[in-house]
Amino acid sequence: MKVYQSKIKKLAGTDYKEIHSLAENLYKQIGTKTKRRPYARSAYFNKDKIFLDYFWRHLWQKNWRDRVRRLKYYPCALDLIKNSKTEPISKQNPNKSNEILHRFAGLSKDKELFFVQITEDKKTNQKSFLSVFPEQ
């Protein structure tokens, strides 16, 4: 599997409030550029929209330690979505038969491995940013 080298560092800090506010500010910056749902255009999917709001719903299902761990890689994940042309691992979602899961691998500027998951609806071809998490 090829890995995308990100040019952006992960968020620094250990406090949840600090990291959450930094990540949320990034999300709001993107949100102000769109009329409806915030999205990023993906280089791999031929500049298709990847909607970002589903990530936040998914994040609230995790405990606070896991949220911090995932939010640290949020800027790296956005960079990967926008610029990566590397082939992901794609498979059918075992929980929903009408979805495909795409898993991209990336390295932060600090050389730390992380993964980004994007779901694609087979009927509507709509793609959503589901999750970002480090290797461990």
Task: Pin down the residues of each PLM region.
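Ribonuclease/tRNase effector modules and their secretory precursors
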Residues: M1-Q136
